Amino acid sequence: MGQSTNPRRVADNEARAKLRMIRTSPQKLNLVAALIRGKKVERALADLEFSRKRISKEVKKTLESAIANAENNHGLDIDSLVVSEAFVGKNLVMKRFRARARGRGAKILKPFSELTIVVREVEEAA
């Protein structure tokens, strides 16, 4: 009699955002993701704002999306949010060809990544 709803994949005090097809290698993206893991969201946003890595702008957008999901979709308090998880996965690899000397060719790999950020609401000990 109708479709049953799927259970939430994250806990009730969590929200997440996912960004796919990021044009950078997972290794480089993981350096920026490690920068924000376990931090309060205000501190993580500040760190990403002043990071010199090119990809930090897209990570910041994804973190802002996770914060907006927490506030609007799950009714969480944004002042008590912490980045509980930030993990990186591999996506496709575009393969290109570069002509070299004497009729040879070299392979160029252009990797893509994906990023998932989970924010959790924590009670602050007073």
Curated annotation (Swiss-Prot):
It comes from the Bacteria. One of its GO terms (cellular component) is cytosolic large ribosomal subunit. GO terms for biological process: translation. GO terms for molecular function: rRNA binding; structural constituent of ribosome. Coiled coil: none annotated. The keyword rRNA-binding applies. Keywords: Ribonucleoprotein, Ribosomal protein, RNA-binding, rRNA-binding. The keyword Membrane does not apply. This protein binds specifically to 23S rRNA; its binding is stimulated by other ribosomal proteins, e.g. L4, L17, and L20. It is important during the early stages of 50S assembly. It makes multiple contacts with different domains of the 23S rRNA in the assembled 50S subunit and ribosome. The globular domain of the protein is located near the polypeptide exit tunnel on the outside of the subunit, while an extended beta-hairpin is found that lines the wall of the exit tunnel in the center of the 70S ribosome. Belongs to the universal ribosomal protein uL22 family. Part of the 50S ribosomal subunit. This is Large ribosomal subunit protein uL22. It comes from Maricaulis maris (strain MCS10) (Caulobacter maris).
